[in-house]
């Protein structure tokens, strides 16, 4: 797992209070990890702060899984 993926995983665990073994690449924030719409907004804000990237609203709407977040951040930092 990349450094970015590890950091994303830690943010998700801290914000949603879920078990680490549930935070896998294909895990949906809402369907698998129990997030609501406010949680997803807070996660996006936490990703922006942690990684120093801006995630526009249209991009944020397409970040539905842990893997989506990692891919977006990797691309934004490239």
Curated annotation (Swiss-Prot):
It is found in: Cytoplasm. InterPro entries: ACP, ACP-like_sf, PKS_PP-bd, PP-bd_ACP, Ppantetheine_attach_site. 4'-phosphopantetheine is transferred from CoA to a specific serine of apo-ACP by AcpS. This modification is essential for activity because fatty acids are bound in thioester linkage to the sulfhydryl of the prosthetic group. Pathway: Lipid metabolism; fatty acid biosynthesis. Its main location: cytoplasm. Gene3D superfamilies: ACP-like (1.10.1200.10). It holds the Pfam family PP-binding. Keywords: Cytoplasm, Fatty acid biosynthesis, Fatty acid metabolism, Lipid biosynthesis, Lipid metabolism, Phosphopantetheine, Phosphoprotein. Residues 2-77 form the Carrier domain. PROSITE patterns: CARRIER, PHOSPHOPANTETHEINE. The modification O-(pantetheine 4'-phosphoryl)serine is found at residue 37. GO terms for biological process: lipid A biosynthetic process. GO terms for molecular function: acyl binding; acyl carrier activity; phosphopantetheine binding. GO terms for cellular component: cytosol; membrane. Carrier of the growing fatty acid chain in fatty acid biosynthesis. Belongs to the acyl carrier protein (ACP) family. This is Acyl carrier protein AcpP.
